[in-house]
Design a protein with these regions (language model features):
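Noncatalytic scaffold domains of N-terminal-nucleophile
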Residues: 1-194, 199-201, 206-242, 248, ...
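A short, polar/proline- and glycine-enriched secondary-structure boundary/capping micro-motif
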Residues: 74-80, 255-259, 332-337, 391-395
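Conserved phosphate/anionic-ligand binding catalytic regions in large, soluble enzymes, centered on
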Residues: 199, 203, 251-256, 391
């Protein structure tokens, strides 16, 4: 079978090539690419990432979406309620919060497990082989991680004892330092044998929760167990000769893409002002908790009538197409010592938590601007995606 891959992470290409003798399909390549990136692209993503997926099913000629983004803990009853805010020169200047109290429950393994169950043709033990081997033997950081860690390594990743040991070599020499993740390799090997749900209800979740509880975080066993995907919360609309399919509310990324496309079709003399106004409108009106799903979908309906992130796209000659965007926020700096997993800081992303640090999120999906999309034209199907946070709205 012929498979195409487009990715912002170069180790994921090597991961795909490692499967070539097994005749992989697009789902297989997607899974091994994503797992590999969560190992290697430290800081940009992590093994506790949230994800949005758009895909086209060739057998039924149907479009679908899966929302596996972060869910807030039901309550904030951990011991640490302090906002550990740091600043860094990344992107000029940015502030974010570190610490395990910024962790929210990610859906990446639910997403990948769903795709593997429906489309996968190769056992997880084979799909995980390359990232496991890479974690065991060690690797140099990919360029996106280097670019980010030049700004974030000291303030965000060297304060935590476990992370400090892991990154000691790259702290000495960012360009040629080697990262070895033996514990993470063991964790992924275990996951490949017992299944990805172990992150939510098995030994892996117990170890992650042990770190969260001992260091003052708020996620609980029930938060992990009760995590659910949101499937087919999507929109389908036309823009000139393009048919666009993406995630609708509660994610706001798809809406923002449509808003910008709408602005680009208005008076060209006021183009810059129009685009700036879209960004301001988002900040003022779309970033809130409550019934965001209905509000965003209503906004999308109006348009169709009148976004630290990795992107992976795969397609195959069975006409299956996948577009996934996944993120770990800026990273909490916390590494779970018994699993080797770095933890996200989704609750600590200041620009995506308008309710304030540990404010009322109503046990909802957190706000995302990520926007993986499927595009259909008379020439066929294409996949596309964008980073999230403020980047999609201010780039």
């Amino acid at each position: 079978m012929k498979v195409s891959l487009a990715s912002t992470a170069h180790y994921s290409v090597e991961a795909a090539e490692s499967l070539k003798d097994l005749n992989p399909n697009a789902a297989d390549v997607l899974i091994t690419s994503v797992i590999t990136s969560m190992v290697t692209d430290i800081g940009v993503v992590s093994p506790t990432s949230g994800a949005l997926l758009s895909y086209f099913d060739g057998s039924s000629s149907s479009f679908h979406t899966i929302d596996g983004y972060f869910n807030s803990p039901k309550n904030f009853k951990g011991n640490d309620h302090e906002e550990h805010r740091i600043s860094m020169t990344y992107g000029g200047y940015v502030e974010t919060c570190k610490g395990v109290n910024t962790f929210a429950i990610p859906g990446i393994y639910k997403v990948l497990n769903t795709i593997h169950d429906r489309y996968g043709s190769i056992p997880l033990s084979k799909l995980f082989e390359y990232p496991i081997e890479l974690a065991k033997r060690g690797f140099n950081l990919p360029q996106p991680s280097k670019d980010y860690l030049r700004h974030s390594l000291e303030p965000l990743f060297m304060w935590h004892a476990t992370s400090k040991r892991t990154l000691s070599d790259v702290y000495e020499n960012l360009d040629s330092g080697v990262v070895v993740l033996t514990k993470l390799a063991d964790t992924l090997e275990h996951m490949s044998l017992v299944g990805m749900d172990d992150f939510y209800i098995g030994d892996i979740s117990k170890e992650v929760l042990s770190t969260i509880m001992s260091e003052g975080g708020h996620a609980t066993k029930n938060d992990f167990k009760d995590y659910n995907l949101l499937e087919d919360y999507n929109f389908i609309t036309k823009s000139k000769d393009l048919k666009l399919i993406g995630n609708a509310g509660p994610s706001i990324g798809g809406l923002m893409v449509l808003k910008y496309l709408d602005a680009l079709q208005t008076n060209k003399s006021n183009l810059k002002e129009n685009l700036i106004n879209v960004y301001k409108e988002r900040k003022a009106h779309y970033e809130f908790f409550g019934n965001r799903e209905q509000f965003i979908n209503n906004q999308i309906s109006k348009i169709t009538q009148s976004p630290s992130t990795i992107q992976v796209n795969t397609s195959d000659d069975s006409n299956n197409h996948f577009s996934i965007t996944f993120s770990s926020g800026y990273g909490s700096g916390v590494q779970c010592k018994n699993t080797g997993m770095y933890l996200n800081n989704s609750l600590g992303e200041i620009e995506l938590n308008p309710q304030g640090f540990l404010g009322d999120t109503k046990n909802e999906r957190l706000i995302s601007n990520m926007s993986p999309m499927i595009i259909e034209t008379d020439k066929g199907i294409s996949t596309i995606g964008s980073p999230g946070a403020d980047r999609i709205s201010s780039a």
